[in-house]
Amino acid sequence: MRIFEPHAHMFSRVTDDYEQMALAGIVGVLEPAFWLGQPRTSVGSFVDYFDAIIGWERFRAEQFGIRHYCTLSLNPKEANDDRVNDGVLALLPRYLEKDGVLGVGEIGFDDITPREERYLAAQLELARAHDLPALVHTPHRDKVRGVERTLAIMREVKFPPERVLIDHNTEQTVPLVIDSGCTMGFSIYPDTKMDEPRMVEILRQWGTDRMVINSAADWGKSDPLKIPKTVNLMRQKGMAEHEIEKVVWHNPVSFFAKSGRLDLRELDTPVSPNQLFEGNSILRGPRA
């Protein structure tokens, strides 16, 4: 079964992860822009970060047979930082036209501040202007209120819900999002957010329409193989193969195809591992 990983921060992962992901059936990965663990102090650091995601990281993934895509944004946490917020917002339009950029994200809330509301609305407008879908981060604290405010702002700016993926959902937020028209994302984590047994129960209770799962693997304690591990449990619990495939392939691919930039033929085309990126390779020298 082919898997499309719709949320993994591969910039912070190692080559072993790519190898194991490919062996587990992951053929495409979507990397949202996010916070790096400490504050960035200038807009220039975002330039380098965006360039790395659309350039080197895309190349690095392909050397392991995985197609790499991304969404770009000013992330919710750094929306509160006046050293960078307006500058990054001004920077984004030229990056949102780049190859492999399938949406605007992660946007949304961290502490649910007025600044975060302002930049969420502004970036939904950017997504509209560039005809791209939006990937929305829901806060780790006060998640229900964050989801409620997200949906309210979407309504205020009249952004179409079918072009929004609201991520990091839990049992508490599903009832809020299920009838909104948004795609619902669930991040399967080792100790927080969502685990495999709870995820399977959510799917059994609410169905698989507009549902996607991801690992949200990053620099913290996380596991880029959480999707295939969840697939294994789905099978053990008797879920039909076509329903499993819907969650891990058809739903995420259909959502990001709304960008008009996701070519399914590309996902089926093998990648040559003998390429160079600006004169560099993943081998760190000639073959032995």
Residue ranges with predicted function:
Residues D82, D86, V144, E171, ...:
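Electropositive phosphate-/nucleotide-binding environments in soluble metabolic enzymes
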Residues A33-G37, I188-K193, A217-D218:
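Short, acidic/turn-prone active-site loops that include or flank metal/cofactor-
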Residues P228-A288:
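Mid-to-C-terminal alpha-helical segments outside catalytic/metal-binding sites
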Residues E62-F64, E156-P160, W206-G207, Q236-H242:
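Short helix-capping segments at alpha-helix termini
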